[in-house]
Amino acid sequence: MADEFFHAGKENCSEQARRSQVSGPRSQFQRSFIQRVTLLGKLPTRFVLHRERKQKVAAILGVDQEAMKSLPEGDLDHCLLSKVDLRRQQISQTMEEVQKIIHLLTTEISRQDSRFEAVPVSDTHNESIKVLAPSLFHVTVPLKGLAGYKGVQRQRWRYYNVQGAKLTCPLRDPEGLQQWLETEMFMKTLWQWHKADVNIEGDIVPAKVLQVFRTLVENAVRTCHLSGKVTVLEKRTTVWVAMETSTGQVELELAPTVEIPTTWPEKAQWPRCLKRWPSPERVECIKSFGFNLVAQSAYHWQLSFSQAEQVLFEQLDEDGGCRRQCFQVLRQLKEDVWCPGRRPVITTHHLQTVLFWTCEKYPHLKDWQVFHQALLRLVRKLHRCVSQHFLKHYFVPKSNLLQSANPSELDAVAQKVAFFLKNPQVELP
């Protein structure tokens, strides 16, 4: 049944990509598609481990080998992934609380300023909230009133600062995942996007959007009587809040985001030539989800492919491989052993990118049938990236995701991962 659904999903997704001509709010089809593939991804799966592999897998995960010998074959997956399951339960509880507060805040923000859209509550996967670490979340707050993305930019120099004053030297051009955002790049715009509180010389300036948004967040915290539960953090270039939950304090980055569905940016030269993964049909489906532009810097908007990445991740193991299980164990090792802490230098998004590059290099099912070999392959890839301080973005390879990371923190992680590779026996806390 799952195969039938994904086959139908690919056909429907391809048809959606052909028919959609105008950018605007993300379609109901795309939202429901993401929720359905996520729900399928959470269904119980059998993780088959042959008896002769027990000791190797136990050594990798630090599980007591004698205890494993006494376990029935069907209970091995539960034993090995028990830490992963515990994490999932804790994150689920935290996510439920975070969603409710974020929905409450953004509903009030949207009431105050119609350019900002409320973040909905979801029973399955919330496409607006991404877990970077157990106590670190990234929340995209959709912006309204920008529809019909054309993507045509005027070639011109910009001589202004955030205050609107004239500069003697032009601003630098965007690099990597960055780009300008002009009102003329859309077929339809609300008149509020032309106001001086966010617009300079026709550009929608992310720093000014963040200034407006920060004030709205502070007002919403007071209006919703959440001052004892939510704190807006100071001295941050973007908007961060600390939130008290039943599992402890978490930090969230609230990022105003322009959603651009059905359009694929020129900077994303994907798929690459002569690559067998993913399939052409899957590529067409994924690209139909488009991309986002996120306010995270002063003058340039940041390209984000969160929806495309989510769909790609959820459909990894249709062939029965163990890619996602390997990723979950890799993430657990990262969070518990190699890179713990509230604001880790390596996040879940970095690990997901490592997984995508490895899947592209090893596209066949045979490469993802032996768990311990597949896991160590991922660990080696992670070690190379961290030790070299270089991890290419999967869709925009010219961008290094570790460029702004702390070098000494990366070196410390690389040392721990190298130690694991020499002696892959780790006791998870």
Curated annotation (Swiss-Prot):
It holds the Pfam family Mab-21. Disulfide bonds: none annotated. It comes from the Eukaryota. Gene3D superfamilies: 1.10.1410.40, 3.30.460.90. Residues 1-25 are annotated as: Disordered. Residues 1-18 have a biased composition (Basic and acidic residues). Belongs to the mab-21 family. This is Protein mab-21-like 3. It comes from Mus musculus. The gene is Mab21L3.
